[in-house]
Amino acid sequence: MIPSKNIQKIKLVTFDAFGTILHLSKPVPIVYSEVAQKYGVHATIDEIEHNSNKAFKDFSEKHKNHGKKSGLNPHDWWIKVIEHSFPTPVPAEMAEELWSYFSKKTGYTIHPLLIDFLKRNKEERKYIIGIISNTDERIRTVLEDYGIDHLIDIYAFSYDVGFEKPSREIFDYAMEKAVKLLGQEIQPEECMHLGDDLIKDVSAARNIQWNAEYCDIKTNFLKYFEQK
């Protein structure tokens, strides 16, 4: 059952990260290629794209949740993905540079409405704001680089929580954090999640009686907060 949305009752608003509030400034294969050239590593864009997609898929299956299940930390997990994205061995410094690139705001564009929305909410204190993302702490460093990490109240990263969307546990984690911040109980229908994956974001949240709407980097998500 999908709850009827009454925006006046919403207390917790959560966003997905990648594809929703953050978008890659350049495609991954292009970034990899540009950095590789600096280190004399030669590979075509097609080779890098094929290898990086395969590496990400393989490591996601063998070492789930960015290595959480295997005892790997996210840094080492990503370094392995980067190393397997090229047909020849790569210098350690090159892999570290690529890791660092995607840990800063230069690697991303941010949703054009997000910063003003967060600043206004901080002043008005309408909602508890959270991020629910199948990722690790690195996303917080990106938001720190944008200077907005303090405008977000709750960070629910799958690596830290131990569960990935669409599992309800990661949504429950965010709601429990909101309860502690507010000092009062929150009902599922008082929560809203925005994300760009119809299964892992929208359906997953609605299945546990949250409000949920589709949102990507181009979506005017402010319309979801207009009282009908």
From Swiss-Prot:
<dbReference type="InterPro" id="IPR006439">
    <property type="entry name" value="HAD-SF_hydro_IA"/>
</dbReference>
<dbReference type="InterPro" id="IPR011949">
    <property type="entry name" value="HAD-SF_hydro_IA_REG-2-like"/>
</dbReference>
<keyword id="KW-0539">Nucleus</keyword>
<dbReference type="InterPro" id="IPR023214">
    <property type="entry name" value="HAD_sf"/>
</dbReference>
<dbReference type="GO" id="GO:0005829">
    <property type="term" value="C:cytosol"/>
</dbReference>
<keyword id="KW-0963">Cytoplasm</keyword>
<keyword id="KW-0378">Hydrolase</keyword>
<dbReference type="GO" id="GO:0005634">
    <property type="term" value="C:nucleus"/>
</dbReference>
<dbReference type="GO" id="GO:0016791">
    <property type="term" value="F:phosphatase activity"/>
</dbReference>
<protein>
    <recommendedName>
        <fullName>Putative uncharacterized hydrolase C7D4.05</fullName>
        <ecNumber>3.-.-.-</ecNumber>
    </recommendedName>
</protein>
<comment type="similarity">
    <text>Belongs to the HAD-like hydrolase superfamily.</text>
</comment>
<dbReference type="Pfam" id="PF00702">
    <property type="entry name" value="Hydrolase"/>
</dbReference>
<dbReference type="InterPro" id="IPR036412">
    <property type="entry name" value="HAD-like_sf"/>
</dbReference>
<dbReference type="InterPro" id="IPR044924">
    <property type="entry name" value="HAD-SF_hydro_IA_REG-2-like_cap"/>
</dbReference>
<dbReference type="InterPro" id="IPR051828">
    <property type="entry name" value="HAD-like_hydrolase_domain"/>
</dbReference>
